[in-house]
């Protein structure tokens, strides 16, 4: 049976050997060039392919149409992937009539995504395994063909567990590959409600936070022990690596990070103490804990820190333009909850952020971005991260004031983008789900979906096209001038402080706010073109948590990425949204203050939005990038969001002149 193989690492080598032993004909192997910054302790797929006389390739982008065509010419009957590090596009997967299969280093559906070997140790698991599954468009989500469990011993570290998994993988492939060859396999669908997903790990993720328990820190040490980069901490500005450790049941009132003793080298943790058995100062040699203490100049009572002392002195400065808006005020709240951010904000009002005005790490100026250009340029230069959140983002304005939409959403934001390029500042830019336009894909994918809009005489697309062009400009600045950026695309975020009822009165609000106003005033809920258009509604708390993780940017995983932030499980039509909102309204304790429900009324979009409007039938995000880059999943059910949003707005209504 002819196959094409995508492979890397030890698992790639053993997968190739297993295929050859099972009588498969390998037409070509696709692998990666080795990263010079990565310690290559594993076998070389390229070398193995060369020794076996098999053509081998390492393209930067195997999903490029030219490579898809070359693979098609090989006419593979089946495709295998063994620890290949890039997602393989659906066009390639569809080339093999017998399907495509991937070997994954966990017991799926648990630990989908990157680095499952390390993550299971970080999380203190006692069992993992290997899974062979059918490949589908979503990473690690296809039906399971075979699994083998592997016990994790208390003394296992990453390399010993790696060897166990390799042994299990050989067994699994020896048992399963002949069955695939003869078409004799039983596939079991994964249980999506049990799925967990983890992102890529980088060396920077392995710092030891001493306020955590000793067992948690010990698991971190196990997860990244040699030949991985190692867990680390600091004495002042001196970095040191912990290669092996033990949990010590030492009851101490010492502050976390304090040295309890130097022989053995014992460090107080949030719970218990961690004994550093072996370690390394800077780029030096590995030594036992007591010698490491001497090398680092530690004595009883010394304090360790999780980051260099010089870095700990200054908070990250975040500039939020449009800080009083829906996203801006919720993001400010999330940032100020931590102690390492200084927030600078500009907006034309302050009603939503009044609760922060006396906060010592919040600095606000009331003003217009089109007027305060000098203030903005100065603060772009001063701050570390810039979020230009100012935009007109209500559909009725796209047809009512298209030029104003263009001037604010495009021209003013382009100026800010250029400031970020000039001063080499990181920009986190709010793209929009609107850029996908009338895309027909089931899931809108950041990297593959086409962006399709209507004709020029439909001005409702001016917002979408303005945002899309800014996305492309930012991307080009990143490619050509090194701009550090992330684009995020919110999908119908909802929650308290989304617009206000006064904005809804003039039609300049998002859907749920307009519907709430109809209930408050006793006017009919208008269903535009019947309200059958479907959207995926996302709780503001889920959205802000994802945005916060983009700002945190662990391991720089978000750099140069486009990230959809939405909840594909919360899909509903506007009509269904109205019905859910009505049911919540009827049960609300303040219901008796408001008029009777006036019913639903179907209206044409042209009579509501005006000439030049087009709607979109569905808008469902792929959140593959959010899972990969942020280790993020939305958690909050749509009904909970509706209840809380409704409650917030009803409690803003002046009830003094309402009948009780």
From Swiss-Prot:
The positions annotated for binding NAD(+) are: 347, 368-369
The record, for SUPFAM superfamilies, names: FMT C-terminal domain-like, Formyltransferase, NAD(P)-binding Rossmann-fold domains
Would I find NAD among this entry's keywords? yes
Part of which pathway?
Nucleotide-sugar biosynthesis; UDP-4-deoxy-4-formamido-beta-L-arabinose biosynthesis; UDP-4-deoxy-4-formamido-beta-L-arabinose from UDP-alpha-D-glucuronate: step 1/3; Nucleotide-sugar biosynthesis; UDP-4-deoxy-4-formamido-beta-L-arabinose biosynthesis; UDP-4-deoxy-4-formamido-beta-L-arabinose from UDP-alpha-D-glucuronate: step 3/3; Bacterial outer membrane biogenesis; lipopolysaccharide biosynthesis
Keyword presence, Lipid biosynthesis: yes
Q: Where is this site: Transition state stabilizer?
A: 102
Q: How does it assemble?
A: Homohexamer, formed by a dimer of trimers.
Q: What is this protein called?
A: Bifunctional polymyxin resistance protein ArnA
